């Protein structure tokens, strides 16, 4: 060490992995820090005693000694080029240079001397490092952990410097478990858990360390490149990807101050792979993706963990230590500003619309913030939507009662094979970011706090989810009720849907819906997937949903239903207003009906607050009848407004869900006062009864025979107190059945009007007749 002109001394702390790197670093130090002492900390070895000796002099007044971290970074040919590593040769070169295998260093330095770059981390005095160590670990410069702490800080400083060369996409955590377990927070956590559980502190410490090692992702640039190259075939050829670039740039600015928690919708196994590639290509740091350990089989588990996947046990019951480990790990990641990602629905949607959110991980995230008052995280709702998915057929089979195939190597091979065919576009869009602390405050205290935050995330996803051509075309064909339509007839059915969505400022693919060529391409893709049948043996081709493929078509249709939900509810409410007697308050009738429908469907769709819901309904009414305040003064006026409306969507939007409720309500009513069997047994019986009722034409929609829809109806029944034994249970079950039957009757009346419209489109009918008014006993649906 030498004294600098400013009176301080310098120590260059290097991290060589080979004699070649040591020579490069020594030469660099002599040029840039002449006379400074160079201390190598070899990878995988203990901190050298010489560093401890240097730091020990801090007690003798040498705290102005400056530590200069430095290491060699091998820059690959692809470092400045975004995009996946696609060729095996490129992968081999990139992986070799990223791994920087020490036996290759002499050859790499000889043939590619420009590839070896020395990166120097931010310098710090020993005094600064002592202050940090005291704050984080509670020790002093003389403690045994101080030298390890300094070496760890040097590694992190070099990581930050390296990212300026390689880009933010290779921001990777280092020694996370060691950082967590060496902190004063960890010691306090062990003491608290020992007191709560009555277990010895040593046992708690061992279990916590084991849990942290089990879940912690150990990212490395070589593993990331290998993982991307291996997983690329699962999505690269399948879709063209369209990204909300402006939304992502806003997030980049936010990420400079806060960790981001990406919460995407979940439709496919490839969601995290495709989303990771979107971020990688735009030089975003790689997310820590929290996923179930059902996907941790070889080689996914080994590679995934090194590429940022955090495998969480799918169930851990009352394991207090494991829960504490998750919370501590998440909090540490946020504190270090590493971004997170998980899928708030808890699994892939089997119906095509957002599932009810799971709040378990959100609870641990909120707990981590509560323990760190100066920390915040920003939730980012993300919509990932596909024109088509190869895996929809398998998910549809599960809903009809089929078994889910277990994930493994055989499953992966089949998935790779299926993904080789191009099937359209994937769209990634970002909703308004939500600061978590503010969201928790606005949700208020109480047991529903986290659920309100999760619903807010889901509402954000729905708002930015575009309506795809596939969703609107399948909506039109399913609404035709197994009738085949010509291309022009499909256009005429789709046009009012597209008009309505554009009036609501919902993104719609104009080129695919407004032109014959675009619409035909959409139908041809659906035909290639077996969803649509094309018959061209007559005067012109006609299109219909293929037999047995209604669940698949409904999956695509359901992706746009949230944009049509308010319209559907309003149509039903107006129908009831049209049934009102003279002298009734029409506005009161409408709001009463809307409130009832909202409660009936609250486990299937996401609704805004009641005040916001009222404003949304009024805006929707302006689209249905712009002069409703002047013209809707009597029930007859309202019935006339329904006849004039260019679009009726309620049967297409709601019938499947209400049909599913009918099956569950019918089974509960049949039980009388008896208890409900175990959930899975009950749902299986509903599948059988649902198939029977469909064959008897007591149900209108084949896609209503669905385990997931029956599950939603069962949650509603539980919410209404129709599961557990109580006074008047049988009567209340029958009352719910009557309520559902009445809604089905209303949908049937609107369906009559809708079918009359379709006959006009087909050229086989006249203008719709007046709306059929409600007459007691009019329903043709047996209970």
List each model region and its residues.
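Membrane-interfacial terminal anchoring regions of lipid-handling membrane enzymes
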Residues: 1-783
């Amino acid at each position: 060490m030498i004294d600098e002109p400013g009176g301080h001394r310098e120590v260059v702390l290097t991290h060589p992995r080979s004699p070649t790197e040591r020579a490069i670093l020594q030469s660099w130090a002599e040029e840039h820090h002449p006379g400074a002492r160079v201390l190598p900390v070899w990878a995988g070895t203990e901190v050298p005693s010489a560093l401890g000796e240097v730091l020990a002099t801090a007690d003798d007044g040498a705290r102005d000694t400056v530590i200069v971290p430095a290491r060699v970074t091998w820059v690959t040919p692809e470092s400045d080029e975004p995009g996946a590593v696609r060729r095996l040769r490129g992968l081999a070169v990139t992986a070799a240079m990223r791994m920087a295998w020490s036996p290759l260093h002499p050859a790499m330095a000889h043939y590619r001397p420009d590839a070896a770059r020395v990166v120097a981390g931010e310098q710090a005095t020993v005094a600064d490092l002592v202050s940090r160590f005291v704050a984080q670990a509670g020790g002093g410069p003389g403690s045994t952990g101080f030298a390890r702490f300094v070496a760890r800080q040097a590694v992190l400083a070099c990581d930050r410097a390296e990212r300026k060369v390689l880009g933010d996409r290779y921001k990777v955590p280092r020694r996370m478990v060691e950082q967590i377990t060496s902190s004063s927070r960890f010691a306090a956590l062990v003491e608290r858990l020992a007191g709560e559980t009555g277990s010895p502190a040593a046992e708690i410490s061992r279990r916590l360390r084991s849990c942290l090692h089990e879940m912690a992702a150990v990212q490395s640039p070589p593993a990331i490149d290998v993982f991307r190259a291996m997983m690329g075939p699962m999505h690269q050829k399948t879709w063209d990807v369209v990204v909300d670039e402006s939304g992502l740039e806003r997030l980049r600015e936010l990420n400079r101050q806060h960790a981001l928690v990406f919460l995407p919708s979940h439709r496919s196994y490839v969601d995290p792979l495709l989303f990771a590639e979107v971020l990688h290509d735009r030089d975003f740091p790689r997310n820590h993706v929290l996923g179930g350990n059902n996907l941790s089989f070889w080689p996914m588990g080994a590679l995934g963990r090194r590429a940022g996947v955090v495998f969480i046990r799918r169930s851990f019951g009352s394991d207090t230590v494991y829960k504490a480990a998750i919370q501590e790990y998440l909090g540490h990641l946020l504190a270090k500003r590493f971004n997170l990602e998980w899928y708030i629905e808890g699994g892939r949607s089997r119906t095509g619309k957002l599932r009810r959110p799971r709040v378990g991980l959100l609870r641990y995230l909120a707990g981590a913030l509560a323990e760190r008052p100066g920390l915040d995280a920003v939730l980012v709702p993300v919509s990932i939507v596909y024109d088509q998915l190869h895996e929809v057929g398998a998910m549809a089979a599960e809903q009809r009662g089929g078994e889910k195939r277990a994930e493994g190597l055989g499953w992966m091979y089949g998935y790779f094979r299926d993904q080789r065919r191009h099937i359209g576009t994937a769209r990634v869009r970002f909703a308004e970011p939500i600061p978590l602390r503010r969201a928790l405050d606005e949700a208020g205290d109480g047991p529903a706090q986290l659920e309100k935050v999760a619903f807010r995330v889901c509402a954000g996803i729905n708002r930015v989810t575009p309506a795809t051509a596939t969703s609107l075309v399948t909506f039109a064909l399913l609404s035709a009720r197994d009738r085949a339509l010509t291309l022009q007839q499909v256009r005429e059915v789709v046009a009012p849907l597209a008009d309505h969505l554009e009036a609501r400022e919902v993104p719609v693919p104009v080129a695919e819906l407004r032109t014959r060529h675009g619409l035909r391409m959409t139908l041809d893709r659906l035909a290639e997937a077996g969803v649509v049948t094309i018959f061209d043996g007559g005067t012109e081709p006609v299109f219909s949903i293929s037999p047995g493929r209604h669940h698949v078509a409904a999956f695509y249709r359901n992706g746009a239903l949230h944009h049509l939900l308010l319209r559907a509810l309003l149509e039903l409410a107006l129908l009831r207003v049209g049934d009102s007697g003279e002298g009734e308050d029409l506005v009161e009738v409408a709001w009463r009906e809307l409130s009832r429908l909202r409660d009936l469907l609250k486990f299937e769709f996401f609704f805004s607050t009641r005040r916001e819901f009222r404003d949304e309904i009024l805006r929707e009414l302006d689209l249905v009848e712009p002069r409703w305040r002047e013209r809707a003064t009597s029930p007859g006026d309202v019935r006339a407004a329904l006849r004039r409306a260019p679009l009726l969507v309620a049967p297409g939007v709601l019938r499947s869900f209400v049909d599913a409720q009918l099956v569950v309500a019918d089974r509960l009513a049949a039980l009388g006062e008896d208890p409900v069997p175990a959930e899975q047994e009950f749902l299986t019986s509903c599948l059988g009864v649902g198939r029977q009722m469909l064959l008897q034409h007591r149900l209108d929609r084949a896609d209503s025979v669905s385990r997931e829809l029956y599950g939603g109806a069962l949650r509603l029944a539980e919410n209404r107190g129709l599961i557990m034994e109580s006074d008047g249970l049988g009567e209340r079950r029958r009352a719910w059945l009557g309520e559902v039957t009445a809604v089905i009757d209303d949908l049937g009346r609107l369906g009559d009007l809708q079918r009359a419209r379709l006959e006009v489109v087909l050229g086989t009918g006249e203008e719709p007749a007046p709306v059929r008014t409600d007459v007691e006993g009019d329903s043709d649906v047996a209970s």
